Amino acid sequence: MIDNKVFCVHGGIPPPWMPGGGFISHLDTLSNDIKNPEDDEPLVWEYLWNDPWFSDFKNSLPPNTKIDDEGFVSNFRRGTGHLFTAKALDKFLNRNRLTHVIRAHEVKQNGFQVQHQNRLLTVFSSSKYCNGSNDSACVLIDNKKLRLLKLDTS
């Protein structure tokens, strides 16, 4: 958490029907020693594995799969967790009185990606990941402004 306004997470946000109802304060009640989060703490699993929804996924949705009223759908790309829409992110941010979510979890060619009305930042700080050609980036927060910095790692 940065300045009580920016939530940093590895993967994404959880659906509100998970334990804690989508309030990040519930994280304080969890153990620091979780051996098997998928089974022992499904909420932690969601924070680790959930991803943002992209509109081009619409053509890839498996048959009889739809986005629920809260803005979540099963993560058919990974086979675990959920995808969350801009609607889901907006509800999560409002519920927790936040302005932004910063996440990692996915390689981005430019090192970063801005989504969901500029309130979700995916930042990947490892350049040339797995011998790839991606750049790396980081976020600077100063005077309540977020700045994405692309890193020169040549």
Predicted feature residues:
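Feature recognizes metal-dependent phosphohydrolase scaffolds
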Residues: 1-154
